[in-house]
Amino acid sequence: MQSYGNPDVTYGWWVGNSVVTNKSSRFIGSHVAHTGLICFAAGANTLWELARYNPDIPMGHQGMVSIPHLASIGIGFDPTGTVFDGTSIAFIGVFHLICSMVYAGAGLLHSLIFSEDTQNSSGLFADDRPEHRQAARYKLEWDNPDNQTFILGHHLIFFGVACIWFVEWARIHGIYDPAIGAVRQVEYNLNLTNIWNHQFDFLAIDSLEDVMGGHAFLAFVEITGGAFHIATKQTGEYTEFKGKNILSAEAVLSWSLAGIGWMAIIAAFWCATNTTVYPEAWYGETLALKFGISPYWIDTADMTGVVSGHTSRAWLANVHYYLGFFFIQGHLWHAIRALGFDFKKVTDAISNLDGARVTLTD
């Protein structure tokens, strides 16, 4: 938290981050509880969409998002993989609700029972077990590059494992291929030339093999990078060029917002135009980009009979774009604060405009 050199800052109740300042276990608890909220929302929304799903109306015209995502990865089809009948969708929804309760319990444990700081971790009992010493390694030292790179490495490995899971799911179970209108097994194409070239035309990708190849490559890069960050430490003097006096909780927050904002904007463009990753059968027809006060996408198909007034693709693309835009604004706000700029000086200057005087002398 930016304090502008004042060690005795009192934050308002609305500054939620202040509650977990320098309390790594509480910080973990807030993350786990947040995961529980997301998991609950996903499960509840899935069951709500399933309850109102009408097989006589195209799925993309019913304003859904959870079920289309599940259908895209081959969940909810009959044994032939050609007819979507909602099979196993209810299980996915209920499973998410159960997981949300587990996450909530873990969040409460970290918030109410476990030590506030993992550096002082002692679990439920005051003994020095090996797992407690291991937990202490995840203490938060915001201006310590060795601590931050150690934690970053674990995040990267988790992302890499998720990519492997997705690639193996497509290879063994299969995902929906709009080219044939059915679920099929997809072998990843680990052609590095294709992967490199798709950096510039990823919106036009029309091969599921290339999509899986990109995820396989990402898995390798992320796991390798994660191992590197866990194993290495700061080399040489820790200078301002490397982040000294800049690396902080607020700086890390700003970078996180930049990353999620950038991903949301990319997802918006991809969703609006690509029909391989976002099949028309589940999301509706592709969109047209328009410009008003800001960019936005509109439906190109006949909206007669569309349940929510817009296709799933339209609201999904637009919501992602605007959320991404505001995430980027949050990134700029927190990045500037992390650099030491005091926004209170701006409000003070504006409030003193009436009393400002300029004296001209010869």
From Swiss-Prot:
Q: Where exactly are the transmembrane stretches of this chain? A: 27-47, 89-109, 150-170, 211-231, 251-271, 316-336
Q: Which UniProt keywords apply?
A: Chlorophyll, Chromophore, Membrane, Photosynthesis, Photosystem I, Photosystem II, Thylakoid, Transmembrane, Transmembrane helix
- Pfam families given in the database record: PSII
- Does the entry feature the keyword Thylakoid, yes or no? yes
An example Gene Ontology biological process: photosynthetic electron transport chain
Topology class, membrane: Multi-pass membrane protein
- What cofactor requirement does the entry state? divinyl chlorophyll a; divinyl chlorophyll b
User: Might you report a single GO cellular component term?
Assistant: photosystem II
Extra info from the record?
This low-light-adapted strain contains 7 pcb genes.
Q: Which NCBIfam families match?
A: PS_antenn_a_b
Function of the protein: The antenna complex functions as a light receptor, it captures and delivers excitation energy to photosystems II and I. The Prochlorales pcb genes are not related to higher plant LHCs.
Q: Which family does it belong to?
A: Belongs to the PsbB/PsbC family. IsiA/Pcb subfamily.
Q: How does it assemble?
A: The antenna complex consists of divinyl chlorophylls (a and b) and divinyl chlorophyll a/b binding proteins and binds more divinyl chlorophyll b than does the antenna complex from high-light-adapted Prochlorococcus.
Q: Provide the protein name.
A: Divinyl chlorophyll a/b light-harvesting protein PcbF
